[in-house]
Design a protein with these regions (language model features):
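Short beta-alpha connecting loops at secondary-structure transitions
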Residues: 55-63, 378-380, 387, 403, ...
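Long, well-ordered, tryptophan-enriched scaffold segments
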Residues: 51-188, 283-284, 441
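Conserved short loop/turn motifs at secondary-structure junctions
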Residues: 163-170, 196-204, 235-237, 344-349
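Short gly/pro/ser/thr-enriched loop/turn and capping motifs at secondary-structure boundaries
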Residues: 50-54, 67-71, 78, 374-378, ...
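Extended redox/cofactor-interaction regions of prokaryotic respiratory oxidoreductases
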Residues: 1-34, 41-44, 70, 218-410, ...
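Glycine/threonine-rich phosphate-binding loop and adjacent beta-strand/alpha-helix elements that clamp
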Residues: 5, 397-429, 741, 762
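A glycine-rich phosphate-binding loop feature that marks nucleotide/adenosyl-phosphate handling sites
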Residues: 92-96, 181-182, 197-199, 229-240, ...
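Long, contiguous, secondary-structure-rich segments that constitute the structural scaffold
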Residues: 439-492, 496-497, 589, 596-598, ...
């Protein structure tokens, strides 16, 4: 979230799209209801199903799964055509006025630079025109034909209300009503908050779904505002912490990037990741990248990391390609993987194409599962009839189960959707042989060191040089790790005026104190300030709220620097006055920025060219994404890889995302509409949490049996009655479940045909105390978003028959 949960109450419009907050986030949804009840907010829901969120909405609009970009691009067109934008915000705070290269183009579904053989783009044309000083050229009149504003207008001009209705199946009147209400928040004293979740991310255009919404917020002037923002409702407790700490194949903590094999030395790595300002006098905060990186290396390797050895740069692995789950399991399938560590995850139930996952795991020599509970992954080799019809005798994978603790059995912090780090304390000791994850990893670390010391080996420096200065080396404590994340002064630190800001050995209070000379250490720069010499800020529990905005700066701690709303400089106009005084976050008092949040802007006075989007080299919000996105600098509608239309009404020659993450062997497992005529989409229920709570008896009682949902019209066509057992199949396999026939799903008229949707809850499997069921991801396709590689769980093709 750029904002936070409580801030939702400040919105005038709450738009829930790509998520189902009332059911998947029932506690957090209270703030949407608070906005309705106490701020007279309008709640809008756009969803393929009429959900519990929709049941309390003021406006509900149905949509075909996988067509969100068409809907949102139609909103962009409406705002532009009807001049329903915050014009001053767009002019000064976005890149609308910057000029784009003359060789950038878009034609027939493809942007300039496409290489059909490699299925990727040369993005060099997706950039600005630069002057002799290296700064992007600008036309503040917005009349130049190559300015972002005019290119955007031309790009979205195709997304008329009729086109939206034809592709999305959303009735035109419903779409226009949504546009009208959203447009009302272009006024400076009104805001919209967008709430989304996996319903947007789990598509082959997932990242572009979110970007399109962010573009709407920029046009409306809602970024940086109380009651505004781009707000992801995280699907797991602490999944925000996972991304913060960089637990991805090409990432490092604090959203730093793991070096690639092309970056052969530290200099080339830092040059590739340290941007230069592209407009004069910008904060360009990523220019501090070397400070964050060197401090990370000092935390990783301690005294072993020195300037003379480039801070241990050579000890980091260098990636040759992205090892996402789609790629890695294909490597397993090809016999290129010997062993697999699975920590706190259940791939057999969570990854797409479950039958392929089981086949891949069967080719391993060994697998280690670290989890508090028995998972389908840990018992994938067992035969459970139709739901897991394997031959145990033919599977030679050796499975090691290491029981771990759950959150209630350990101290630590949880990072919520709003970036708040909240400390929690152990409720009870772990049962039996269970150990916490830190203790398990410490045991592996020490045993590996002992083996290398005894037997020798090559390439051992990353392990042997690692800093491991815990009081109990075999059982690191949560507070020690938290302090490492925060960071220390390794020498006395002085500011530019010679004033001492931290003594050697003291905890740091700000990432502004990090240095690139080896005098500071921090494992995660964005967490600096979370545990200072004044104590554990994550344990703060003062919920006083003098502003009434819900920022509660004394409750827990939010990164960065306890700031509750990112880019809050944008909440004030170019003169430093709040767009809406009633929702003032920060303002200029004549000498500094002050207010109801931690300012993100230093002391740059109003009237200077410094833009509010401090992480961007141009200081502006990007309506044109220059060279960042895989499939284009503007969003474009591409059909799901399994489309019920068999074409793309906008450009039949480019049906689906042209740079989608799809391997040849997986392409053979994609279905066609002739055999699988209905859209399948997966989702969660309030009564269960993924595949975890089927181990809990009360949850199993609340939702005891696997079911799927279909419309009354589809049920009539297929001769299915409510409560019948049905078989749902895709090109990859089948599941059996009870049919729930409901009016909450309806057919949509799309491109001259009726499109039906089959709703598939995800929570069942063959482990736990709940009734045994089939794994929903038996049906889903092994294809991913080109940016995040997230699989397409939300739009695929199925058939359904009475069992």
């Amino acid at each position: 979230m750029t904002n936070h949960w409580v801030d939702i109450k400040n919105a005038n419009v709450v738009m829930v799209m790509g998520g189902n907050a009332a059911e998947a986030h029932p506690v957090g949804f209270r703030w949407a209801m608070e906005a309705k009840n106490n701020n007279d907010a309008t709640l809008i829901v756009v969803d393929p199903r009429f959900t519990r969120t929709a049941s309390v909405a003021d406006i509900y609009a149905p949509i075909r799964s996988g067509t969100d970009i068409t809907f949102l691009s139609g909103v962009l067109r409406y705002l532009i055509e009807n001049n329903k934008i915050n014009a001053e915000y767009v002019k000064h705070y976005t890149n609308a006025s910057l000029l784009v290269r003359d060789d950038f183009a878009f034609e027939d579904g493809l942007f300039s630079g496409y290489d059909a053989e490699k299925r990727q783009y040369d993005k060099s044309s997706w950039n600005y025109q630069f002057d002799e000083n290296g700064y992007a050229k600008r036309d503040e009149t917005l009349t130049h034909p190559r300015c972002v504003w005019n290119l955007l207008k031309a790009h979205v001009s195709r997304y008329t209300p009729d086109v939206v209705e034809n592709i999305c199946g959303t009735p035109k009147a419903d779409f226009l009503k949504v546009c009208e209400v959203l447009a009302s928040t272009s006024a400076p004293d009104r805001t919209t908050t967008f709430l989304y979740a996996l319903g947007w991310t789990q598509h082959t255009v997932g990242a572009q779904n979110i970007r399109t919404m962010a573009m709407i917020q920029l046009l409306l002037g809602n970024m940086g505002m109380a009651g505004g923002g781009v707000n992801a409702l995280r699907g797991h407790s602490n999944i925000q912490g996972l991304t913060d700490l960089g637990l991805l194949s090409t990432s490092l903590p604090g959203y730093l990037t793991l070096p690639s094999e092309k970056q052969v030395d530290l200099q080339s790595y830092l040059e590739a990741n340290t941007p230069k300002a592209t407009r004069p006098d910008q904060v360009n905060y990523w220019s501090n990248y070397p400070k964050f990186f060197v401090s990370l290396m000092k935390s990783f390797y301690g005294d072993a990391a020195q300037k003379e050895n480039n801070w241990g740069y050579d000890w980091l692995p260098k990636w040759d390609q992205t090892y996402d789950v789609i790629k890695y399991f294909n490597m397993m399938d090809e016999g290129k993987v010997t062993g697999y560590f699975c920590q706190g995850f259940n791939p057999v139930a969570s990854f797409p194409d479950k039958n392929k996952v089981v086949s891949c795991l069967s080719k391993l020599k060994y697998m280690v599962v670290i989890d508090p509970l028995v998972t389908e992954t840990s018992t994938f080799w067992q035969n459970h009839g139709e739901s897991n019809d394997v031959d145990p005798a033919s599977i030679q994978t050796e499975v090691f189960r290491l029981p771990s603790t759950c959150f209630a059995e350990e101290d630590g912090s949880i990072a919520n959707s709003g970036r708040w780090l909240q400390w929690h304390w152990k409720g009870q000791d772990a049962p039996g042989e269970a150990r916490n994850d830190g203790e398990i990893l410490a045991g592996i670390y020490h045993h590996l060191r002992e083996l290398y010391q005894a037997e020798g080996g090559k390439g051992v420096e990353p392990l042997m040089k690692m800093s491991w200065n815990y009081k109990q080396p075999h059982e690191p404590q949560s507070d020690e790790v938290a302090k490492e994340n925060n960071g220390y002064a390794l020498e006395d630190l002085y500011d530019a005026n010679g004033v001492l800001i931290a003594k050697k050995g003291q905890l740091l209070s700000s990432f502004a104190h990090l240095r690139d000379d080896g005098t500071t250490a921090s494992s995660c720069w964005i967490y600096t300030g979370s545990w200072t010499e004044q104590g554990n800020q994550m344990a703060n529990r003062d919920n006083s709220d003098p502003s009434g905005l819900g920022n509660t700066l004394g409750w827990a701690w939010a990164w960065p620097l306890n700031r509750r709303v990112l880019y809050n400089r944008a909440s004030a106009d170019i003169n430093g006055k709040p767009w809406d005084p009633k929702r003032m976050l920060i303002q200029w008092n004549g000498s500094k920025w002050t207010g109801n949040d931690i300012p993100d802007f230093g002391n740059a006075a109003p009237g200077t060219p410094t833009g509010p989007f401090i992480m961007q080299p141009e200081g502006m919000g990007r309506l044109f994404a220059i060279n960042k996105m895989a499939e284009g600098p503007f969003p474009e509608h591409y059909e799901p890889i399994e489309t019920p239309l068999g074409t793309n009404p906008l450009h039949p020659n480019v049906v689906s995302n042209p740079v989608v993450r799809l391997y040849e062997q997986d392409a053979l497992r994609m279905g066609k509409k002739e055999q699988f005529p209905y859209v399948g989409t997966t989702y969660r229920l309030t009564e269960h949490f993924h595949t975890w709570t089927k181990h809990a008896l009360l949850n199993a009682i609340a939702q005891p049996e696997q079911f799927v949902e279909i419309s009354e019209t589809l049920a009539a066509v297929k001769g299915i009655n409510n409560g019948d057992r049905v078989t749902v199949s895709s090109k990859r396999g089948f599941i059996r479940a009870v049919a729930v026939v409901t009016r909450r799903l309806k057919p949509l008229n799309v491109n001259g045909q009726q499109v039906e949707t089959v709703g598939i809850p995800i929570h069942w499997g063959f482990e736990g105390v709940a009734r045994k069921g089939y794994i929903a991801n038996t049906l889903t396709p092994n294809v991913g978003d080109a940016n995040s590689q997230t699989p397409e769980y939300k739009a695929f093709l199925v058939n359904i028959e009475k069992a």
